Amino acid sequence: MSEPMTSDDLEDFGTEIADQVTSFLMAVRAVARGDAPDSYVPILLLEISQLLLGGGRLGAIRDVVPDERFESDAGPDPDLDELREKLAALLKPVNTYKEVFDPLATKSEIETRRISDDLALICADLAHGLAHHRDGRITEALWWWQFSYLSSWGPAASAVMRALQSIVARSRLDPTR
């Protein structure tokens, strides 16, 4: 783990993560709108990979401890049903994939997942932290992004990245598919 960050370091780091989050959310929304009909899978792969770089940075720093014991209200959660539905329609031929739930467990479970559901979950977690950041609660935003990276959006993003990479690899290595 790294040394503790100063408040200035945390603010700079929070801005960097917020920029990555904003970029990811904008790209996913653009894909869902149909802005890249011929390249949506490679674009999503690139965006999820970039996001995981930020997640790795969050995982590498010491635990961020919020100023308050209880999380401040970040406002209503975004309604991502339309985004999920548009992504599901776009990804229909490749949306469903299999994932090993916990590869370190002695008895691994294989789950059936949907890329569209996982992307919507990731967007919800990221938007929640972004609401804190926009309200000036930098430590709270970083705490949320770090906690949810480790517990929710990080595992989902890793699974989606593997699924998207598999789709890209199959399309390039086996052109008959």
Language-model features and meaning:
Residues 2-5, 18-75:
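N-terminal interaction modules that seed assembly of large macromolecular complexes
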Residues 9-13, 110-115:
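A ubiquitous short alpha-helical element
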Residues 37-40, 76, 115, 138-142:
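Residue-level recognition of alpha-helical structural elements
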Residues 60-103:
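Heme-based O2/NO sensor domains and their adjacent alpha-helical segments
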